[in-house]
Regions:
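Short helix-loop junctions at transmembrane helix boundaries
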Residues: 294, 309-354, 365-374
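N-terminal Sec/SRP start-transfer signal
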Residues: 1-11, 22, 27, 290, ...
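Basic-flanked hydrophobic alpha-helices used for secretion and membrane insertion
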Residues: 120, 133-225
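Hydrophobic alpha-helical transmembrane segments of multi-pass inner-membrane transport and secretion
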Residues: 1-19, 243-278, 301-310, 358-362
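Peri-transmembrane interface segments
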Residues: 1-2, 207-262, 271-273, 282, ...
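Short acidic/glycine-enriched loop/turn elements at secondary-structure junctions
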Residues: 63, 72-165, 190-192
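Transmembrane alpha-helical interface segments in multi-pass membrane proteins
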Residues: 269, 278-322
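Hydrophobic, regular-secondary-structure patches
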Residues: 11, 15-85, 91-114, 220
């Protein structure tokens, strides 16, 4: 019973940690990703006309539509250079207050193509040695002119160049902070050379809107030439990987639980040998082989299920304590969270209980049949 309880407790804790990590990732995505994202079904760029945009805005639940133009480019400043990911946005991005809470220094504005300012990830800001006090020498941004590259070799005529000053520093998460520069949309169009084209249209919903319902309405409006993704679908591979890892952990722990159930197997086997005389007395009293078999199977289930209940109770208490007090630290400097995240799901307890019942039932079959054979001398 003790071994089963320990395995069940460990399984509940591990599954709760995976749930917590998934919940944390989703919360992190909510910080910088839109509720819905409109992409072209087969092209790198997408463009919606004024009629389409007006029709989308009329859908209940849609608060903002943010056109964005994204691509990688090179920035240079003070003999330093870095490949970053530019994200061009218009005034609707600022109107939606996106990433405003993540500003740790500076002012939340972008300017325009004539005098461009940018919201810069803190990693980019520090690695490039940027400063708000510098108002003379802007940061240079370079991007290859693909049309010229097809006809000429790489030289200064095949590179587009723009300049900007930092207006604010953003701190979101490491990968975002180390590569993101948010710039005015018109500035980004000039750098990339694709006026009117967008990487995506990002939709922010009102608080009471259902993302799946709005998604279906947008898809119905735009047709098959466009793809509409929810926030989870934008990170489908990562979330799927977490679920697969959780499944494999469950299977591995179930296998370990199966090994631990050998203690139940031997305990019941010894009980059969020890109670041989008592079993024959039961036979003399008229017990049938089927009744005896059920008795030992039921005994095995009681022992294992008692251990499972104790294990689930201990797992619940320890998970609750970690959730409330952060007992086990994450151990990563400058992490967004200090302790391992925990999120308990009722289905984890249910499937753990099912796994315990199935495994222990199988482990009880041989001792139960052995008891019947020894008592009734069945070969």
């Amino acid at each position: 019973m003790i071994s089963v309880g320990i395995e069940v407790m460990a399984l509940i804790l591990i599954l709760s940690v995976f749930n917590g990590l998934e919940d944390f990732q989703k919360g992190l995505f909510k910080t910088f990703d839109p509720d819905l994202r409109i992409l072209s079904a087969d092209q790198q760029r997408v463009s919606l006309n004024a009629t389409q945009l007006a029709s989308i805005r009329s859908i209940p639940g849609i608060a903002f539509i943010n056109p964005v133009l994204e691509d990688q480019g090179l920035i240079r400043f003070d003999q330093k250079q870095l490949v970053v990911r530019f994200k061009g946005v218009d005034s609707s991005f600022l109107a939606a207050n996106r990433l405003k809470k993540q500003v740790v220094e500076g002012e939340y504005f972008l300017g325009d193509s004539a005098q461009a300012f940018a919201l810069v990830g803190i990693g980019v800001f520090l690695n490039m040695g940027m400063s708000f006090e510098n108002t003379v020498e802007p940061i240079q941004a370079w991007y290859p002119d693909h049309n010229r590259l097809r006809r000429f070799s790489l030289n200064e005529n095949t590179i587009r160049s723009q300049a900007f000053f930092p207006s604010a520093v953003l701190e979101v998460e490491q990968s975002f902070d180390n590569q993101t520069v948010i710039v005015p949309l018109t500035w980004m169009e000039s750098l990339v050379g694709t006026p009117g084209m967008r990487s995506a249209y990002e939709i922010m919903l009102s608080a009471d809107a259902n993302d799946l319902q709005v998604k279906e309405k947008v898809k119905e409006l735009l047709g098959k030439d466009y793809t509409v993704q929810t926030r989870d679908e934008q990170h489908a591979l990562l979330l799927k990987a977490i679920k697969i890892e959780k499944l494999f952990v469950f299977l591995i722990m179930a296998f370990v639980m199966g090994i631990a159930s050998f203690t139940l197997f031997y305990a019941l086997s010894l009980l059969v040998i020890e109670k041989r005389k008592d079993l024959r007395s039961l036979m003399a009293m008229g017990i049938s082989p089927k009744q005896l078999l059920k008795s030992f199977l039921f005994l095995g289930l009681i022992i294992s299920f008692s251990g499972a209940m104790v294990g689930m109770l201990l797992g619940f208490v320890m998970a609750w304590a970690q959730q409330q007090f952060g007992i086990v630290p994450l151990g990563i400097p400058n992490a967004l969270i200090d302790a391992y995240p925990i999120q308990m799901h009722a289905m984890d307890f249910f499937w753990t209980a099912i796994a315990v019942i199935v495994i222990t039932f199988i482990a009880s079959i041989f001792p139960a049949r052995k008891a019947v054979q020894m008592t009734f001398k069945i070969k």
